[in-house]
Amino acid sequence: MKVLAAVAAGLAAHAFVNARLLRVPTETTATAQVSVLLPLRDEAARVEPCLRALLAQTGVDLELVVLDDGSTDGTGDLVRALVDGDPRVRVLRGRPLPAGWLGKPHACQQLVDAAAPTSEVLVFVDADVVLAPHAVAATVALLDAMQTDLLSPYPRQAAPGATVLVQPLLQWSWLTFLPLRLAERSRHASLSAANGQLMAVRRTAYDRAGGHAAVKGEVVEDVALLRALKRTGSTGGVCDGTALATTRMYDSWDELVDGYGKSLWTLPLPTLAVLALLYVVPPVAALRGSRAGLLGYAAGVAGRVVSARRTGGPVLASAAHPVSVALLCLLAGRSRLQHARGALSWKGRSL
């Protein structure tokens, strides 16, 4: 138990160092020509704030290309009404999904194919993301300043209700386990973190890696794309997007269970075992009177507090960190079972 507590304490210290080193985009202008790419499938209920924020971007020369990927809820008509003939915007109809492709990579590849050939940077945005007016310019400017090929500013994650137990684990995971400054310069694919909610990619690097065609069957296509870039000599990583973007991925616990279910089966079993050993076993031991277990629990909570304070997350939820990790492991187990049964789907498409 003392070893587990010591490792958890070391990881909390690592998260603290990462939090201090995490790059922060600043409000500025960008000189590159940019294509902002927005894939949509049945997003009529949430796309309006995202779209209005994109149309209000400042400090950057951009075009906005929107793909309606077979929506059945009027998404395309709503988008056309909202853009109201804005010359910066093109709205496309998605083509049928080819064999061997998943929906998100196919939509993104179509968007890139339709982007202006003069665009130097591709910025992918999800429909549940609302950007600050300077977000695109600040992202592209930092991409250039870092002389890197992919930059993913991690948005602030709004987490209502019970989703607060799991959603903050996104930022906590890479702050805790990934050496960020090393990862952003390393070409080792294993040192990769990215988030397709907001992601800027240098077009030359994207093309060299094979684009989304190189990750056409990947459920976690954002991280897979960065790994493909690294395998072809590029670099990239994450930065703090708290002041640039906010996203609310799920409105309820049931939505979160379905959403996480489509991808958590990809987590290796050894990873889940390590998480349980480090963050679930010590607090259980603490309840049985173990001082080392109590220290291990405190270390886990400390790491979560560091992450929450750095990324605008809920600090009080950090106290329930063992519950959060246990729930993550259960969700991963459910996802694995559904994947084995061939029962996973997302927005009407099998995964």
State each model region's role.
Residues 74, 125-142:
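Acidic donor-binding/catalytic loop of UDP-sugar-dependent glycosyltransferases
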Residues 1-30, 168-171, 176-180, 321, ...:
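N-terminal membrane-anchoring/stem segments of glycan-assembly enzymes
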